[in-house]
Regions:
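Glycine-rich hexapeptide-repeat left-handed beta-helix
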Residues: 1-17, 50-58, 64-66, 70, ...
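N-terminal segments that cap or nucleate solenoid repeat domains
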Residues: 2-41
Length: 188
């Protein structure tokens, strides 16, 4: 399936992508989706804005197998420099800037995640939950377990930066052995 077949109109709304955004083979975008500068949507991710809008802001990345959807009452807004891990589900929620959403985490309708926070792998952010800025949120159902240190918070955008470099390599056709440097992992 080529890119034109994976970028689908719905109800007279079409996805819009910044010229330097990257959409990997197998990813699908439907309806009122806006993908910002240097943002990326990776293999087998589904971004479906059939009932409301989805905004993926600059330098954010939606990793392999993630699902982004909306509800009648809420769109989904993903801030700048956000990393949405493999298999995560974001449904009708708001994610602040420089947030790391761990692999297989779920964020439900009306939830808001404050900037510079980490949603741990497999965490469940229930509907309407407000996660304060700078929080480490773990568990299912999840809860804030502690505040992130200033050093941990400042390192979160580096994960998104890695994906900006990686998507540029894919766009430029750089050989498979390319590997941008890994950011340091924040302590949990």
């Amino acid at each position: 399936m080529n890119l034109a077949e994976r970028i689908r109109n719905f109800a007279a709304k079409s996805p819009t992508l910044a010229p330097d955004a990257y959409v990997a083979p197998g990813a699908v975008l439907v309806g009122d989706v806006h993908v910002g500068a240097q943002a990326s949507v990776w293999f087998q991710a589904a971004v479906r804005a059939d009932l409301n809008a989805i905004h993926i802001s600059a330098r954010s990345n939606i990793q392999d197998g993630a699902v982004i959807h909306v509800a009648d009452a809420h769109g989904t807004h993903i801030g700048e420099d956000v990393t949405v891990g493999h298999g995560a589900i974001l449904h009708a929620c708001k994610i602040g800037n420089a947030v790391l959403v761990g692999m297989n985490a779920v964020v439900l309708d009306g939830a808001e995640v404050g900037a510079r926070s980490i949603i741990g792998a497999n965490a469940l952010v229930t509907a309407g939950t407000q996660v304060p800025e700078g929080s480490l949120f773990l568990g299912s159902p999840g809860k804030v377990v502690r505040a992130l240190t200033p050093q941990e918070q400042s390192g979160l955008a580096s994960w998104a930066e890695r994906y900006v470099l990686l998507s540029k390599a894919y766009l430029d056709g750089v050989p498979q052995l390319f590997a941008p440097p890994l950011p340091s992992t924040p302590a949990a």
